[in-house]
Swiss-Prot record:
Binding positions for ATP per the UniProt entry: G34, P35, S36, G37, C38, G39, K40, T41
Protein name: Taurine import ATP-binding protein TauB
Gene name tied to this protein: tauB
Subunit relationships: The complex is composed of two ATP-binding proteins (TauB), two transmembrane proteins (TauC) and a solute-binding protein (TauA).
Predominant location: membrane
UniProt keyword S-adenosyl-L-methionine, yes or no: no
């Protein structure tokens, strides 16, 4: 379980997050949404251990987070892949740094590449891939070390609508298969409502938890209902419009 208690953090000498309290259980998909400047990415960087926080605590499985660790896998918006390595070697890179024996890490990489639908592309270089394929590689690399927690920082933002829908579907299927804790940062309201088992709305200046919304649309999808059916459901549309209104309220209040 991820547990964040009374978290305060600064960014560039200014308060970025104030009194953040969140929990994320195994098998849950927590989505964090809010207007620009609300501290979404700062929160993810704190959980990943990339930057320090000033007060409060962040614990994963009862252990405090003080820096990066293999128990947390991160998928970045710009993928963060190595262009001089092929798909297989990018996926295996973290395992190589961890000292995993070559044959073992290549076998794990092969399984992860297959899991994200890129089987047969192992020897292709990153510059030969589409945006959606690169994000699949990023997800495979993050999962290769079998982390307890998967963190994703607006990973679909640069993708076209069709590809974004494909990668959303892939992520939900992987979430169901692995049972991992997943935390997703996004600015896309429909994406947030569709994918979250709990949606956290942040307000800006500094970032605070405005509202927490338990949702079941992601569970309906992994149970077999189509995304088109879910997104045309009046309940989904009503929730999307409610969340949109809340985000606009915050943006207007702090503009």
């Amino acid at each position: 379980m991820l547990q964040i208690s009374h978290l305060y953090a600064d960014y560039g000498g200014k308060p970025a997050l104030e009194d953040i309290n969140l929990t994320l259980e195994s098998g849950e998909l927590l989505v964090v949404l809010g207007p620009s400047g609300c501290g979404k990415t700062t929160l993810l960087n704190l959980i990943a251990g990339f930057v320090p926080y000033q007060h409060g605590s962040i614990q994963l499985a009862g252990k405090g987070i003080q820096g990066p660790g293999a128990e947390r896998g991160v998928v970045f918006q710009n993928e963060g892949l190595l262009p001089w390595r092929n798909v297989q070697d990018n996926v295996a890179f973290g395992l190589q740094l961890a000292g995993v024996e070559k044959m073992q890490r290549l076998e794990i990489a092969h399984q992860m590449v297959k899991k994200v639908g890129l089987e047969g592309a192992e020897k292709r270089y990153i510059w030969q891939l589409s945006g959606g394929q690169r994000q699949r590689v990023g997800i495979a690399r993050a999962l290769a070390a079998n982390p307890q927690l998967l963190l994703l920082d607006e990973p679909f933002g640069a993708l076209d609508a069709f590809t974004r829908d494909q990668i959303q579907t892939l992520l939900l299927k992987l979430w169901q298969e692995t049972g991992k804790q997943v935390l997703l940062i996004t600015h896309d309201i429909e994406e947030a409502v569709f994918m979250a088992t709990e949606l956290v709305l942040l307000s800006p200046g500094p970032g605070r938890v405005l509202e927490r919304l338990p949702l079941n649309f992601a569970r309906r999808f992994v149970a077999g209902e189509s995304s088109r059916s879910i997104k045309s459901d009046p309940q989904f549309i009503a929730m999307r419009e409610y969340v949109l209104s809340r985000v606009f309220e915050q943006r207007e209040a702090f503009s």
